Amino acid sequence: MDLRTGEYITAHQATSGVYTFEITNPLYFTITRHNQQPFNSKYNFLTFQIRFNHNLRKALGIHKCFLNFRIWTTLQSPTGHFLRVFRYQVYKYLNNIGVISLNNVIRAVDYVLFDVFENTIDVIEQHEIKYNLY
């Protein structure tokens, strides 16, 4: 849903994309919070954010696009290693498709978390998307 207008994102907006070779470094990955084994449990909670680059947003007609994911996992790897492997696998998936769009990025994250990584228990998605009005 577009946060500015409250309208749902159309299929055309979600699937329109840009070739991967046209834009360098299209996504920005960051870990916003890491709760390592809270309350002596064997689970980790990772919260990370994917932001679209300015050139990618300009090509897709997006004003703001933050994709926030909260992962519940039993992986014990350091957060820097997790982020590096996660970013590599997402870029690999997108390069195989050849087009970067909103739907393809969400599919890439879903593929990496549930098919590539083991021990992912649950993922909560929260998006902040604003399209250009003009």
UniProtKB/Swiss-Prot annotation:
**BP terms from Gene Ontology:** viral process
Annotated Pfam families? Gemini_AL3
Please provide the record's keywords in A-Z order: Host-virus interaction
The entry assigns this protein to a family as follows: Belongs to the geminiviridae replication enhancer protein family.
User: What quaternary arrangement does the UniProt entry report?
Assistant: Homooligomer. Interacts with the replication-associated protein (REP). Interacts with host proliferating cell nuclear antigen (PCNA). Interacts with host retinoblastoma-related protein 1 (RBR1), and may thereby deregulate the host cell cycle. Oligomerization and interaction with PCNA are necessary for optimal replication enhancement.
* Described function: Increases viral DNA accumulation. Enhances infectivity and symptom expression.
Protein name, per record: Replication enhancer protein
Q: Which organism is it from?
A: Tomato yellow leaf curl Sardinia virus (isolate Spain-1)
